[in-house]
């Protein structure tokens, strides 16, 4: 079973503070091609494309200008991404054995790199998968990646009797996986909060829950999809009603803090 996560917009390139293996992204050749296009982007173009302010546009132009796919990356992907998913994953507290297992069972989808192993060393960048970007292959990153990510995932499970993908990525990122080209079964986990008898998907909690489930699967070496219903971290419980073979629903009482506006 292969687990998929989304990346995060924010990144942290402070030192990890421990000795870790640093690997090379499997689709680095495609990244090299893509970086030739992103290097040509102006700050105004980046601002319009990403819908960000002038300062962030200048920062990301500098990142694209400095990006060199032929040079070793700066920090391992699972430690560089900084968002709710990665607060749930807590890669910095995973053991060396856990990270080694994750190298074969976890992939982080990426607009710049396609699919990343947790310990793939990456450069600073921001390039959301859903943004429009003209390349020789089309008008979007979905056009650029085409069926390449799906074929990469197929190769990772080529020897599996029954290939299974546990989709913990957002719709924006999972859309980059060509379902027609993808072999095997896809199981998507959904997380909702219950309040006053109503279930709601609150994104900040759902994102963290995705990371928590990925961590749980890593620590427990989950390879049988039938075991996924046992996930119970953070107060979540599997709900048979509302689930199906390809969609698993997990719910919990909504935390009191959910109604408060974040500072």
From Swiss-Prot:
Coiled coil: none
InterPro entries (UniProt xref): YaaA
GO biological process, alphabetically ordered: response to hydroperoxide
Pfam families: H2O2_YaaD (PF03883)
GO cellular component annotations of the record: cytosol
Family matches, as NCBIfam families: PRK02101.1-3
HAMAP family on file: UPF0246 (MF_00652)
Assigned protein family: Belongs to the UPF0246 family.
UniProt protein name: UPF0246 protein Mmar10_0828
């Amino acid at each position: 079973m292969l687990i998929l996560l989304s990346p995060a917009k924010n990144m942290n390139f402070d030192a990890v503070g421990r000795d870790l293996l640093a690997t090379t992204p499997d689709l680095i050749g495609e990244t090299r091609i893509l970086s030739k296009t992103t290097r040509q982007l102006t700050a105004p173009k980046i601002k319009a494309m990403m819908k960000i302010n002038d300062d962030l546009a200048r920062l990301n132009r500098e990142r694209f200008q400095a990006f060199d796919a032929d040079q070793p990356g700066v920090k391992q992907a699972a430690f560089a991404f900084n968002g709710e998913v990665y607060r749930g994953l807590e890669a910095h507290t995973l053991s060396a054995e856990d990270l080694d297992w994750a190298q074969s069972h976890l992939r982080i989808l990426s607009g710049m790199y396609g699919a990343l192993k947790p310990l793939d060393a990456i450069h600073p960048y921001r390039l959301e998968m859903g943004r429009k970007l003209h390349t020789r292959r089309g008008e979007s990153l979905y056009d650029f990646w085409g069926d390449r990510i799906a074929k990469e995932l197929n190769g990772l499970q080529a020897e599996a009797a029954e290939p299974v993908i546990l989709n913990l990525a957002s719709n924006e990122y999972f859309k980059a996986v060509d379902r027609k080209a993808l072999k095997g079964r896809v199981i998507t986990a959904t997380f909702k909060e219950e309040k006053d008898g109503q279930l709601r998907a609150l994104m900040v909690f759902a994102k963290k829950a995705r990371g928590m489930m990925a961590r749980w699967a890593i620590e427990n070496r989950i390879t049988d999809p039938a075991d996924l219903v046992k996930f119970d971290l953070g107060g979540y419980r599997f709900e048979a009603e509302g689930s199906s073979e390809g969609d698993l629903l997990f719910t919990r009482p909504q935390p009191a803090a959910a109604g408060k506006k974040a500072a």
